[in-house]
């Protein structure tokens, strides 16, 4: 009888989708439960890191936790180049929000600028502005009421087009057969 079956695994990583697929194929009803850290879910990680980054003058760890959710509209390659530049120059606070364009060599002190280096820095500066703009709008929100802060956060999520990104990710996961993961989006 199905009600007398239990499948236990110390680590369900990698087994969950397989178990779902096999049980579904043979028509065996099932319930699967696993402990998960809710703050590691991409949407919550995005929200908490955006609030922390904007509220703490853009520390690199929070800013890049926000970008590493994959929900901000920049590619992994773009994010990695931006992170390398930020770590090379130990960028903090006003370095992210300054009006003056970035002009530090992408490889550090004492290097001669080539045309390629200048183009890369200009591109990184444009990327920085694109990344920071929605966070700055959140940070500069004047309405400190709960409603005002919620609306500012909602605006950030709208500015980065979160609903579309979530739908795309869910569709991608569903096409790969990862229905449980897709349902979380």
Regions inferred by a protein language model and the residue ranges of each:
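Polyanion-engaging groove/track-forming segments
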Residues: 1-185
């Amino acid at each position: 009888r199905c009600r007398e079956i239990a499948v236990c695994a110390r680590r369900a990583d990698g087994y969950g989708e397989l178990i779902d697929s096999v049980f579904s194929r043979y028509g065996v009803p099932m319930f699967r439960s696993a402990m998960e850290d809710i703050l590691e879910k991409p949407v919550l990680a995005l929200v908490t890191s955006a609030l922390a980054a904007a509220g703490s003058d853009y520390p690199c760890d929070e800013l890049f936790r926000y970008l590493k959710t994959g929900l901000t509209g920049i590619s992994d390659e773009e994010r990695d180049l931006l992170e390398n530049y930020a770590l090379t120059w130990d960028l903090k606070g006003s370095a992210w929000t300054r009006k003056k364009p970035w002009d530090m060599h992408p490889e550090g002190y004492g290097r001669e600028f080539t045309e390629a280096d200048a183009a890369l820095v200009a591109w990184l500066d444009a990327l920085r502005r694109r990344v920071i703009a929605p966070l700055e709008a959140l940070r500069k929100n004047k309405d400190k009421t709960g409603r005002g802060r919620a609306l500012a956060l909602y605006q950030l999520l709208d500015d980065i087009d979160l609903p579309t990104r979530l739908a795309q990710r869910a569709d991608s996961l569903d096409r790969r057969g990862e229905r449980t993961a897709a349902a979380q989006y």
